[in-house]
Amino acid sequence: MAAEPNKTEIQTLFKRLRAVPTNKACFDCGAKNPSWASITYGVFLCIDCSGVHRSLGVHLSFIRSTELDSNWNWFQLRCMQVGGNANATAFFRQHGCTANDANTKYNSRAAQMYREKIRQLGSAALARHGTDLWIDNMSSAVPNHSPEKKDSDFFTEHTQPPAWDAPATEPSGTQQPAPSTESSGLAQPEHGPNTDLLGTSPKASLELKSSIIGKKKPAAAKKGLGAKKGLGAQKVSSQSFSEIERQAQVAEKLREQQAADAKKQAEESMVASMRLAYQELQIDRKKEEKKLQNLEGKKREQAERLGMGLVSRSSVSHSVLSEMQVIEQETPVSAKSSRSQLDLFDDVGTFASGPPKYKDNPFSLGESFGSRWDTDAAWGMDRVEEKEPEVTISSIRPISERATNRREVESRSSGLESSEARQKFAGAKAISSDMFFGREVDAEYEARSRLQQLSGSSAISSSDLFGDMDGAHGAGSVSLGNVLPTADIAQFKQGVKSVAGKMAVLANGVMNSLQDRYGSY
């Protein structure tokens, strides 16, 4: 493998190539003193146009600096020697490529043919000359004295003039007509050959000068075009923008189509999963109906009264796969049961029967409701199964002795107790939170309640003040008012109504849970 050229050889070669007039301007824009080169086309470019060529890709144009890069190889140097701005301009013009847009110009058929031609010429020059710095056709790039010297050598070689005629060949071309007359006058026998030979040399020099002038004209024209075009940013044409816009529209359509396909697949998978879920719900509903049918009469009535009897509910239902239907609101069974419980609790005798046994329901929801309404011993489901003691007047505890965690449940039935609070404290000038929530001591509360009752009377007795009402009433008339003071009766009624409110809230929670779980049927 041949050794790579050193830095001195590279600088010498490019100094000579850039001395050619056509290589002193940029090939694309005509800017002066280009310092970059496209090895693919063998042309010299300015720094702006070199950036445009880099954006095209190395498969279209390979760019290197003639001053900064020192890793040139012999094949790349041969491509620059066989190329040149003049040869590239003539080739593109000959094949009808006059486009100014770089993308259009270097993707054309003419650019492809010229790339192949430069590659072939560079390979041939490398195989012929090897590591020699100069090649044969470099003589056309040197100054004009070399052809004249060759012509003079040619004439001296063939005419063999005498020694005294030698000084006549040394002057420049402007003094050549005088020696021609002398030679024609001195050597008469050789007049014909000498005249012909001397007559050909001026023609050759004239032709050479005309070719040089012809080469300068395109360079001047390019300089004018470069001055009009200005910076490289003005090379972008409307065609490139339209092409980019078209590509963007195609990409947008493709993205929309992909999004639509993905959405369609998601909908199909959702419909399939909904069908499976609906089938599972149908199977579960049939199982629950069978369980409910196997219940005995009393338990079945209790389940239907609490809203757990799915068979007795309305047969109107809808599927998740069918169209939606408007379902009219019906009065829940739990509301009727709660109202009936309130009516039953108004009578003291029926209070001993107790609430229904929720442990007997077919859905085994006792633990969930026990955890929802707090773990109170009085409302636990395990305690419901035990035999409840008979409720008497002495077994009723005051509000202050009850568990504090029940107040969270009582807050939910505050709407039912608001009317009682208004009636209780209607005549009071000021009340406290202990009075409102019943957190006062029993004796103090009873004394205050008696004072409030006797505030409007004109005269009072000790029996009225201390609650000794035996003398006022007959012995035969025994009632709840005779057994309990007025304050205790109010507390008893309030306790009964609070219990009824709790039962209503609990029944409502049972109904809501059943509707949430089995409402899709």
Curated annotation (Swiss-Prot):
A zinc finger (C4-type) spans 26-49. Residues 171-186 have a biased composition (Polar residues). It is a peripheral membrane protein. Disulfide bonds: none annotated. Its main location: cytoplasm. CDD domains: ArfGap_ArfGap2 (cd09029). GO terms for molecular function: GTPase activator activity; zinc ion binding. Residues 242-308 form a coiled coil. Residues 146-156, 399-411 have a biased composition (Basic and acidic residues). GO terms for cellular component: cytosol; Golgi apparatus; Golgi membrane; plasma membrane. The keyword Transport applies. Residues 143-202, 218-241, 397-420 are annotated as: Disordered. The keyword Iron-sulfur does not apply. Keywords: Acetylation, Coiled coil, Cytoplasm, ER-Golgi transport, Golgi apparatus, GTPase activation, Membrane, Metal-binding, Phosphoprotein, Protein transport, Transport, Zinc, Zinc-finger. The modification N-acetylalanine is found at residue 2. Residues 97-521 are annotated as: Required for interaction with coatomer. Residues 11-127 form the Arf-GAP domain. The modification Phosphoserine is found at residues 140, 146, 201, 237, 240, 312, 334, 340, 364, 368, 432-433, 513. It is found in: Cytoplasm; Golgi apparatus membrane. GO terms for biological process: COPI coating of Golgi vesicle; protein transport. SMART domains: ArfGap (SM00105). Residues 221-233 have a biased composition (Low complexity). Vero cells overexpressing truncated ARFGAP2 show accumulation of cholera toxin A subunit in the Golgi complex rather than the endoplasmic reticulum. GTPase-activating protein (GAP) for ADP ribosylation factor 1 (ARF1). Implicated in coatomer-mediated protein transport between the Golgi complex and the endoplasmic reticulum. Hydrolysis of ARF1-bound GTP may lead to dissociation of coatomer from Golgi-derived membranes to allow fusion with target membranes. Interacts with the coatomer complex. Interacts with the C-terminal appendage domain of COPG1. This is ADP-ribosylation factor GTPase-activating protein 2. It comes from Homo sapiens.
